[in-house]
Amino acid sequence: MENKEKIYEGKAKIIFATLNPLEVIQHFKDEITAFNNKKAAIIHEKGILNNYISSFLMKKLIDKGIKTHFISLLNQREQLVKKITIIPIEVVIRNLAAGNFSKRFQIADGTPFKSPIIEFYYKNDELSDPMVSEGHILSFQWLTNQELEKIKILSLKINNILSELFFNVGIKLVDFKLEFGKLHNDEQSDLFLADEISPDTCRLWDISTNKRLDKDRYRLNLGNVIEGYREVAHKLNAIPNL
C-alpha cells in the first residue's frame, strides 16, 4: 500500500484510494482537537487505539445486523472501508447530560434521561456545526422523510447495542456521535454507518467512579488522555494480535 493517493484529510483521519473504486483506506492520526479546532495537539498512540476500538465496535454492530462501511482491519493505523458519500448531518445520541448539553439546559453532568435524546447537527466547520431540526433536514433535502426516520431507528438500535456492550465491561455510554452515508455513486443505496466509533466520538465514563475515559480528558485538561483511551481498549479487549 505504498505511495497511496490521498483523497481527503480531516482532523483525525486520512482517506486513501485503493485499486478498487468502491473501497478506500481509512488512516487514523494522532492529532486531537477540541472546540472546533481551536485547541489541538498530538497524542501519541491515539490513532492506533481509535483504529482498534472502532474496528472492534463496527464488527460488533455488523454482527447485530447494522450495515457499516467497515470491511477489515489492515494494520495498527488503517482499516479498509467501503467508499461512502457522507450525509452532512451528525447524529448525537444522549443517554446522560454532559458537556454543552448540561450548560444549555443548566442541569448537572450525569443526569440520566428517561429515554435517549437524539440531536442533529449540520456538518460545517465554518458554521461551527450548528444544531438543526428535522424540519431543516427535510427542507434542505439532506435526507428524505423515510431516510430520516430510518436514521432515527438505526441510531437508537446502535445505542442499545453499544450501551449494553459498554455496560458489560464497566463503562457508561454517556453520549456519542454517528455519521451515515450512502455507497459512492449510488443514490439508491441503503444507509450505512460510517466514520468511527471511539473515545474521540463517544463520552465514556467508568461505571463505578465516573472517571472520564474519552476526549473530555483533553477538552477539560484532566491529563493522562491516552490512559483513558487505553483503558477503553483493554476493557473491550479490542487490541488484536496482528
Swiss-Prot record:
Gene3D superfamilies: ATP-grasp fold, B domain, Phosphorylase Kinase, domain 1. It is an enzyme of class 6 (ligase). One of its GO terms (biological process) is cobalamin biosynthetic process. It catalyses: 5-amino-1-(5-phospho-D-ribosyl)imidazole-4-carboxylate + L-aspartate + ATP = (2S)-2-[5-amino-1-(5-phospho-beta-D-ribosyl)imidazole-4-carboxamido]succinate + ADP + phosphate + 2 H(+). Pathway: Purine metabolism; IMP biosynthesis via de novo pathway; 5-amino-1-(5-phospho-D-ribosyl)imidazole-4-carboxamide from 5-amino-1-(5-phospho-D-ribosyl)imidazole-4-carboxylate: step 1/2. The keyword Cytoplasm does not apply. Its EC number is 6.3.2.6. One of its GO terms (molecular function) is phosphoribosylaminoimidazolesuccinocarboxamide synthase activity. Belongs to the SAICAR synthetase family. This is Phosphoribosylaminoimidazole-succinocarboxamide synthase. The lineage of its organism: Bacteria, Pseudomonadati, Pseudomonadota, Alphaproteobacteria, Rickettsiales.
